[in-house]
Each structure stands twice: as C-alpha cells, then as structure tokens.
C-alpha cells in the first residue's frame, strides 16, 4: 500500500478512517454505532501498513468520533452495530442507548452554558461601556462656539476703530476744500461751480459773469447776485 501523509489531528485520522473503511466510519450525516472491540480490529487490520498511525492516535480519534453529537444521535433503540466492513454485529441494548442519551444531553447543556456565559459577559461589558457613550457629545463644541464668539467680539472693535479712523480723514478733506479761497479772477471761468461764503456757512453757486467790480453768480436756490472774490471759495 502507498505511504499515507502524516496525520496530525484526530479529525484528520477520522477522515482517513472514513476513506479507508467507508462502510463503518463517516464524516457526514448520522453515524452508525460501532462494534464493541472495534479498536482491536483496527489495530489488527492496519498492522503492517505504513500509514504512520499510532495506537494513541487511533484511540484518541475513536474517542472523539464516539462522543460527537452525530454519533450519539445514531445510538438509539433498534440500531445495529457494524464492523469495519459494515457488517451487522448485534443490536444496541437499552443500557447503551440510555448512556448515549445522557451523554448527548450533558454535551448540549455544556454548550448552552457556554453560550449563556458569553451573553452575560457581553451584557456586562456593554453596561460598563454605556457611561462612556455620552462623552463624545460633551467634547469641545461649546469651547469652539465660545472661541468663535470671542473672535467676533474682537473684530467688532476693529471695525469701529477703522470707521473712527476714516471719519477724521473725510473731515480734514472737507475742511481743506472749504478753506481754499479764490484769490484772483483769472482762477474763474463761466459755468464754474464755486461756493459763496455767508458768515459761517457757504452755499454752492455757478459763475454767470466775471467783471472788474465782482463776479455775478447764481445760487443753488436760483437767486443771482454779484459778490467779491474774497467771498468765493473752491
């Protein structure tokens, strides 16, 4: 027989036995109850074969196979045991069936207990994490808003300052314009806009005529009059 690859786990050994003895072992569906003393039959049948399997590996694989839920489900009243070739080797007795039923119930109870323990642990961890959830909502949004408000408050004085700086400039320009007197008739021409000073106030006027005695102007209100150059401004 050809050399078999080395089998490292009990599951691999079971897969090998199912391939070597398909009428006795299986990897899917309900397993058939095994003949009492099947271990000795395996050792005798496989003696001399270069399969690399030890007695310890065979015993561990059989223990795993016969304790699986799939195998225990197959141990029931009326079922027959089989040998390596699938031949019937006697009907299961009630004592063996009851023992298998108890093993199956205990196995299911252990699995359920493990599931319940995981659920409790997950629930406890969830409760411990719950107080931390509100923290993201309390991160620094308020601080950022305060910062924005603070920046706005800083900008307002700047705008006021800029406005206050611009106003004196406008006044100075106006003052300069009002304080420019007409010193010579040569500075004037017909239709030119000038200002006529009357006390502390000045009124806009348009030049109508220029004579040696004075300048005839028309005020914005329609009144025409003759004024001297010292009463005119640009």
UniProtKB/Swiss-Prot annotation:
Pfam family, one: ProQ_C
Subcellular location: Cytoplasm
Keyword Cytoplasm: yes
Main localization of the protein described in the UniProt heading: cytoplasm
Polar residues composition-biased segments: 177-186
Family in the record: Belongs to the ProQ family.
NCBIfam families per the UniProt record, alphabetical: PRK04950.1
Entries under PANTHER family matching the protein: RNA CHAPERONE PROQ
Its biological purpose: RNA chaperone with significant RNA binding, RNA strand exchange and RNA duplexing activities. May regulate ProP activity through an RNA-based, post-transcriptional mechanism.
Protein name, per record: RNA chaperone ProQ
Organism per entry: Edwardsiella ictaluri (strain 93-146)
């Amino acid at each position: 027989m050809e050399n078999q690859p080395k089998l490292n786990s009990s599951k691999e050994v079971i897969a090998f036995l199912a391939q070597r003895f398909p009428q006795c072992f299986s990897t899917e569906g309900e397993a058939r109850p095994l003949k009492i003393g099947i271990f000795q039959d395996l050792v005798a049948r496989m003696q001399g074969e270069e399969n690399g399997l030890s007695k310890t590996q065979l015993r561990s694989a059989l223990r795993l196979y016969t304790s699986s839920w799939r195998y225990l489900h197959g141990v029931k009243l009326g079922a027959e045991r089989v040998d390596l070739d699938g031949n019937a080797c006697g009907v299961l007795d009630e004592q063996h069936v009851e023992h298998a039923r108890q093993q199956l119930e205990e196995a299911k109870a252990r699995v359920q207990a493990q599931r319940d323990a995981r659920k409790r642990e997950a629930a406890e961890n969830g409760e411990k994490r719950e107080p931390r959830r509100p923290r993201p909502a309390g991160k620094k949004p308020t601080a950022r808003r305060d910062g924005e408000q603070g920046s706005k408050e800083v900008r307002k004085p700047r705008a006021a300052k800029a406005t206050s700086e611009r106003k004196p400039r406008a006044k100075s320009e106006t003052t300069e314009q009002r304080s420019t007197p007409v010193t010579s008739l040569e500075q004037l021409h017909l239709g030119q806009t000038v200002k006529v000073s009357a006390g502390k106030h000045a009124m806009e006027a348009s030049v109508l005529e220029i004579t040696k005695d004075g300048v005839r102007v028309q005020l914005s209100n329609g009144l025409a009059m003759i004024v001297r150059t010292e009463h005119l401004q640009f």
